[in-house]
């Protein structure tokens, strides 16, 4: 509703540019199912499509625009009004505490075989927790964030390829802009699949990074604080390490959280994210230069 009113205030029809949720007979935007579940319904947006993955730099730039515009339109939303659907979701300090506990408890008896992986992730802990600690010190503001900034959470016009709106709003919570930016980069600019076994294929695609950064910063760059601008590249590194350490934690715990297709699936995922994070660190200066280019 907030975004819809923002769009309408510009004189543009909001019909295809924001999700419209239907109300139930009691006026609420959800319905309780017979088994106690919650359901809601949004209007179908005609002539729209999504992309699970893409190499099209134009689409990637549009994806960046979509999430940047999402940030822009909600920049003055009272963030404290948001309900926290997943507590401590990007609390990287707690993610590493959970990792340490998984190593110590060794529930699945796998710790010895992945000592090298454990050591490499522990070496990245300070990097991964820097932005969270900055936020706790008041150096980075909490804003409205999407928290699942994948390309497939944007609707695009089938004909023009331009973005229409951001979807899948279940995880909208207070968070850091750099984490939304970073998680998108982790997903869209990886040269390989998330569970690629051959880590020699894993790297940060700087062309894709630039395409997304151009779109994102072009929309919301002027609204960012200096610290937010300076940590966009670090956000990509942080989200990649966090994702990887979660995969390795789950592997050590016996694959109890993430759905897996084979015994070492979480380990392959963790190693892939580790390789990507290490390549990002090597290319951090290049990432920062690209960010600065569009600010």
Segment roles from a protein language model:
Residues 1-99, 177, 188, 193-202, ...:
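Conserved ATP-binding subdomain of kinase catalytic cores across diverse folds
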Residues 138, 152-193:
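Catalytic activation segment of kinase domains across protein kinase-like and atypical kinase folds
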Residues 62, 66, 120, 180, ...:
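Charged catalytic carboxylate motif
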Residues 26-32, 130-132, 248:
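A short, acidic/glycine-rich surface segment
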Residues 229-239:
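Small/polar glycine-rich anion-binding or flexible loop at a beta-alpha turn
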Residues 8-10, 14, 161-162, 246-295:
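Regulatory N- and C-terminal appendages and interdomain linkers associated
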Residues 174, 178-222, 238-257:
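Active-site activation/catalytic loop segments of kinase-like enzymes and analogous catalytic loops
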Residues 48-63, 76-146, 151-165, 259-261, ...:
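ATP-dependent phospho-/nucleotidyl transfer catalytic cores
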